[in-house]
A protein has these predicted regions:
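Generic structural signal for well-ordered alpha-helices
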Residues: 118-122, 150
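Substrate-gating cap/lid alpha-helix
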Residues: 131, 136-172
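Short hydrophobic segments within beta-strands
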Residues: 20-21, 136
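Conserved SGNH/GDSL esterase-like catalytic core that processes O-acyl groups on lipids
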Residues: 13-18, 24-108
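Membrane/wall-proximal cationic-aromatic binding patches
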Residues: 1-19
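Soluble non-cytosolic domains of exported or imported proteins
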Residues: 30-34, 108-116, 143-147
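A generic structural signal for well-ordered alpha-helical segments
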Residues: 39-40, 125-126, 156-157, 162
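Short, conserved loop/helix-junction motifs that constitute active-site signature segments
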Residues: 10-12, 76, 126-129
């Protein structure tokens, strides 16, 4: 774990970044302007934001992260970075955590669990857009289920060698 302020500065200038998430990614509390728009303006990059309030990682219907990623994001789009929000909605709804798979096969993940959905999203993004994948967590709040999700995400990070912007464990926030 490292503090967010110590992240290596790698420019996304003139790159295409996909953001997948729910209300935080959407910017719900800020008139639908989130950090994605800020990054786009600051770094002159193209941000594709696929965010719907109240949605989950687990595949439980047409607005789940997985369904929207498959159905609304162009697989032929050039993508330089894929960033996904670790949804608090899964924690609030007590979505099953599941297990980290030993497989890397897209079709082997249990997408009705948080771990399976995370791994599916990573595998799909890597196979479809051949780009780096990152997840970001929310800052700490009173939620044992979300704490377990963050713990699982950090283990998945080791398996898949993805980036994690870990606001949950960042004591500077």
């Amino acid at each position: 774990m490292f503090p967010v302020f110590r992240l290596k500065k790698q420019s996304v200038k003139r790159k295409t970044v996909v953001f997948l998430g729910s209300s935080v990614t959407k910017g719900f509390a800020a008139h639908n302007n989130s950090f994605a728009e800020y990054i786009a303006k600051k770094d002159s990059c193209t941000c594709i934001k696929e965010a719907v309030n109240g949605t989950t990682l687990i595949d439980n219907g047409e607005d789940s992260y997985i369904e929207r990623m498959r159905d609304r994001l162009d697989p032929k789009q050039q993508v330089d970075l894929f960033i996904c929000q670790l949804s608090t909605n899964d924690a609030t709804r007590n979505s099953p955590l599941g297990e980290i798979s030993e497989s890397r096969d897209l079709e082997s993940f249990d997408v009705e669990t948080v771990c399976g959905a995370i791994e599916y999203i990573i595998a799909y993004a890597k196979e479809t857009w051949h780009c780096p994948v990152m997840f970001y967590t929310n800052p700490q709040y009173d939620s044992k289920p979300y704490a377990k999700m963050v713990e699982a995400l950090l283990k998945i990070q080791e398996k898949w060698q993805i980036g994690v912007i870990d606001f949950w464990n960042d004591e500077q926030i």
